[in-house]
Amino acid sequence: MRFIFIIIFISFSSKGQNLYFPGKLWEEKSPESQGIDIKKLDKAIEFAISNENSVDKDLRISIIKSFGREPGYKIKGPTKKRGDSNGLIIKNGYIIGKWGDTKRVDMTFSVTKSYLSTVAGIAYDKNLISIDDKLKDYIWDGKFDDTHNSQITWHHLLNQSSQWSGELFGTYDWADRPPRGLSLEEIKKQKLLPPGQAYKYNDVRVNLLSFSLLNVFRKPLPAVLKENIMDPIGASSTWRWYGYENSMVVMDGVNVQSVSGGGHFGGGIFINSEDHARFGLLFLREGVWNGERLISSDWINKIRVPSENNPSYGYMWWLNRGDRYWKGLPENIYYGSGFGGNYIIVIPDHDMVIVSRWLDSSKVGEFVKMIVDSHN
């Protein structure tokens, strides 16, 4: 029995040692060498190119068209005209397919939330926060003081069930994605459930998570992400993370920008597809990069747990379950998703990462299925 255990241990250790991680240059392999039918893969790439998202290239126009109906809506952060469809397919760590300009920096909208979740994971791993702690024990400026908000935990903010009520950087919680057909007074008077009792996708509350983490780290979150994640995985120097024109916070006597968790009001992370792919590969490798653990396995497991009120959502990563299930694909797929068809898709069962920019969002499941089905 002991002899068998040693063989198994050596086998797993050898497998771990043979995993490929890109250096400054990312090695490309032929699809055939990785067990992929090149004709099927090419067909999938052609599908992505021919199903580009219809959002206007001038994303400022697209954002206003999509969200301008919201009460008091205003673009408060930077925007950028987008590029054409592009992306990469990673198999066994190697690039086996790509299309378009994968070095072009673009807005990535709510894929930013998956990066923000990772910053929360860094705080968790450093024992700066405990998931079930109440925010009132960390933030004392009034945002969590009343009876309702005082019950909110980090867990609630991370799975978007906080039901936080208030105003942040000039926008009220009720003004973000309100139900259609209601008057302004009806929107304001919507009843809130107790924290943890309902899922509501809400960028004001996501930005509250960012603000709260800024208060925990007492330094800019882009610097935290850069030092702990992006530099170790070899990301380029071109990515940026923005907040709003009015989201400056005085931290220890210094003005620091509280960054946003998406591009709903402008801002968020601007990044190229190759850096996205490195980030996705880190998660495919369960938080380890070239032998160095950057994120705990505990945190990696937490982000993939379906939330109590939405089985398709974990800690700011989407899960292939519930209403978001892609038919015929493994349930353990998880992904970051952003407005306009921005995706980082992690497929553990096939040792794959897919990054796709500006894909028609209604076609993403079909696109992923085509890639998975290209295995010989």
Positions of the model-derived regions?
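Active-site Gly/Thr loop motif
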Residues: S247-G263, G267, V305-V353
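Active-site-proximal alpha-helical segments within enzyme catalytic domains
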Residues: S114, R205-S212, G267-V288, N342-W358
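Structured C-terminal helix/loop/strand segments within mature extracytoplasmic catalytic/sensor domains
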Residues: G336-N376
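Active-site SXXK
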Residues: D37, G93, M107-D132, L157, ...
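Catalytic-site signature segments of enzymes, centered on catalytic residues
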Residues: I95-G100, E167-Y244, G267
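Active-site helix/loop module of the DD-peptidase/beta-lactamase fold
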Residues: D125-W164, F217-H264
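Active-site-proximal loop and beta-strand segments within enzyme catalytic domains
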Residues: G23-K29, I49, N53-G77, M107-T108, ...
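N-terminal leader/targeting segments and the immediately adjacent pre-domain N-terminus
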Residues: S14-D101, K126-I129, N215, S374-N376
